[in-house]
Amino acid sequence: MAFRASGPAYQPLAPAASPARARVPAVAWIGVGAIVGAFALVAALVLVPPRSSWGLSPCDSGWQEFNAGCVAWDPTPVEHEQAVGGCSAPATLIPRAAAKHLAALTRVQAERSSGYWWVNGDGIRTCLRLVDSVSGIDEFCEELAIRICYYPRSPGGFVRFVTSIRNALGLP
């Protein structure tokens, strides 16, 4: 038996891959690596810092923290127009619900038999009577009342995202 040397010794099963096809998996791996890297970065941002670093920003100088907001006041009673214009932006007169809560916390009902606070009434002359925490408008209010300025503090969207993930994972 003679061997034939005239042709290839084997037949390929599939045609050779083109160079363009060989690069597609490399691009896919780079994309997957970028996604995994971004996920690891977000996970590190969520898990590594303590919860206290994701809290609300502190109140400005001269303001007191009150729940999720900041308050400042002057104990001198003023007229409504002066009270409305006396709060520096972004602050406004304290909202009615926050004023009732502040009155209950400071127990001003026990200390005073009369007195009023101006509250935010969206342009309407609105006040809160301290003795019983009843709010009213116009004639219900006295001419002079105490101005309490208030501005809310709220965390940004990413902070809410981080705290919700930490809560879901049961992290302190």
Swiss-Prot record:
Per UniProt, subcellular location reads as:
Virion membrane
> Its domain of life?
Viruses
User: What transmembrane ranges does the database entry give?
Assistant: 28-48
UniProt keyword terms in alphabetical order: Membrane, Signal-anchor, Transmembrane, Transmembrane helix, Viral envelope protein, Virion
Gene Ontology CC: one annotated term: membrane
- All ranges on the Intravirion side of the membrane: 1-27
- Which parts of the chain does the record assign to the membrane side Virion surface? 49-172
Membrane topology reported for the UniProt record: Single-pass type II membrane protein
Q: InterPro entries recorded for this chain?
A: Herpes_UL45
* Chief location: virion
Write down the Pfam families for this protein, in alphabetical order.
Answer: UL45
Q: What does this protein do?
A: Important virulence factor of HSV neurotropism. Seems to be required for glycoprotein B-induced fusion. Dispensable for growth in vitro.
Task: Say which family it is in.
Answer: Belongs to the herpesviridae HHV-1 UL45 family.
Please report the name of this protein according to its UniProt entry.
Answer: Envelope protein UL45
Give the organism, scientific name: Human herpesvirus 2 (strain 333)
Lineage runs: Viruses, Duplodnaviria, Heunggongvirae, Peploviricota, Herviviricetes
